[in-house]
Structure formats: C-alpha cells, structure tokens
Amino acid sequence: MQADLDAFLDHLRNERQVSQHTLDGYRRDLAKVHAHCEREGLDAWSALDAGRLRRLIARLHLQGHSSRSLARLLSALRGFYRYLLREGRCRHDPAAGLSPPKGERRLPRTLDADRTQQLLDGAVEDDFIARRDQAMLELFYSSGLRLSELVGLDLDRLDLAAGLVRVHGKGNKARDLPIGSKAREALRAWLSLRAQARPADGALFVGRTGRRLTPRAVQLRVRQAGVRELGQHLHPHMLRHSFASHLLESSQDLRAVQELLGHADIATTQIYTHLDFQHLAAVYDQAHPRARRRKDDTS
C-alpha cells in the first residue's frame, strides 16, 4: 500500500507539479487513511470500503478534526483513487458520495483598513532584513498572494515597470497580478540591498546566506511584524484575506476578486461577501437613527 502512495505522490510532484505545501497536505491526509487501513487489517487499497472509511471520518471528527479538514482529506483520497483507477490498481472509490460532518464555516480573520495602514506605515530601517520584510508585507497585501506563491517567486516573475507580478498558484496555474505603488517602492528598496546576500539562484526573497526563504521563516517574520506594530500575532494569509475583503468592499466586483485570488470556484470567494456584510451592518448600527440604542435603553 505504501508503494501505491509513494507512486501517487511522485505523480503529483512530477506530472501535476503541485507545490510542496500541497504535496505535504496530501501526504499527511493519506497517511491517516493508510494507518486506519492497517488497524483494520487491510493490505490493499482495493479492500477499503465506504463503511470502513465512514468509521475513520467519524473517529477523526470525535477527535476534534474540523469539517473543513475532513473535507480536504476526502478530496485527497478521491484524487488518490482516481489515480489508482487509471492505473488499474482498484475498481472502486470508497470516498465517492461521502461528505464530512457539517460544521460552521468560520469567517477568515482580517485587519481593517486602518490597522493595515498602521502595520505597513511603521518606521522601516534602511537595512537588509527590514527592507526585505517590508517588501514582503507590502506584496502580500498589494497582490493578495498565498504564502507558497510569495516564497516561490523568482526575480524574472517581477515587472516593476509594468507594475505586474506573475505567480503560480494551486495546480501550477499562472496568473498576472497588479502591484500597487507602495509595494513597488518597497520592492525597489529591497532589490537595492538583495545582492548583499550573494543569492545562489533567482529567488526574490532570500536570507543573509543567499538561500530562498522557507514558508516557516516568512510566517515568523510576519508574526514578528504584527507584534511589533499592532501588538497581535499575524499570519500571511490574514493579509491575503484583508486584501480580498478591502477590495470587495470598495469594488463590489466578486468575479474580479475571484480572478485576483486565483480561486477556481467563486463559492470560495463568496465567503468575503459575509465579511463585507459584517462591515455594512456595523456601519448601519452606528449610523442609522432607528438602529442606535439610546444610552438609557436597558431593555
């Protein structure tokens, strides 16, 4: 069974050219299913049936796994079985028709526009690390990049004269994104210092040793910036969420936001309409004469 898993992961890496982040997710999810099969005494993927798979999903749900993580596991398993079916390794997909337990969909956390400006307008020293980190923060928010997209950027994907950056998202799909003027300024300042590290390749964001930054290193730098400027922990995806929410709030163009984020399904983008409604509801509560509570209203 492990040989089939390894062959599938090689297929994803070499044929589908998925990102390392996506590959690691498939590996973790499928390892859980593999361990369950071993507990059930199964020695082939063709022996896994829907009943056994339901027991696994129920057990993981009771252990606290979210509906979203279980949906991702089932999606990974369906992809794996499509591969096995094509290779003639089995004749059925036990995950077909199975759905994870329903759960509330959490709204993504965002910064409001003022807090975002406070983060990005903090004092920046003219040194290697500070300029690099500022460029990363500006680019995350300016173009709504995923963490994996920013880490994977090379110099030749950047066209500052045209104000564009080409990123490769999920499924290695390329999209060209605009870069705002503040982000362009920050990138130019960073590029003036980047050569100090003597980079070994064309990676846009590197450490002092010249090597491409890892996702973990970028997460740490964003978190430290959040604590320093805002007194709170930040994650790179929070800047992507803020980009989407602020853009939708200003433009009301859901399709454009979908294209910029690289979402295959507009339903994924629609989560930001709930954030926009929250903003409008807050404005209504503060401004509408029939919505404001009187100070002496204790009912």
Curated annotation (Swiss-Prot):
CDD domains: INT_XerDC_C. Keywords: Cell cycle, Cell division, Chromosome partition, Cytoplasm, DNA integration, DNA recombination, DNA-binding. GO terms for molecular function: DNA binding; tyrosine-based site-specific recombinase activity. It is found in: Cytoplasm. Residues 106-285 form the Tyr recombinase domain. Disulfide bonds: none annotated. Residues 1-85 form the Core-binding (CB) domain. InterPro entries: CB, DNA_brk_join_enz, Integrase-like_cat_sf, Integrase_catalytic, Integrase_recombinase_N, Integrase_SAM-like_N, Recomb_XerC, Tyrosine_recombinase_XerC/XerD. One of its GO terms (biological process) is cell division. GO terms for cellular component: cytoplasm. The active site is at R146, K170, H237, R240, H263, Y272. It comes from the Bacteria. Coiled coil: none annotated. Forms a cyclic heterotetrameric complex composed of two molecules of XerC and two molecules of XerD. Site-specific tyrosine recombinase, which acts by catalyzing the cutting and rejoining of the recombining DNA molecules. The XerC-XerD complex is essential to convert dimers of the bacterial chromosome into monomers to permit their segregation at cell division. It also contributes to the segregational stability of plasmids. Belongs to the 'phage' integrase family. XerC subfamily. This is Tyrosine recombinase XerC. It comes from Azotobacter vinelandii (strain DJ / ATCC BAA-1303). The gene is xerC.
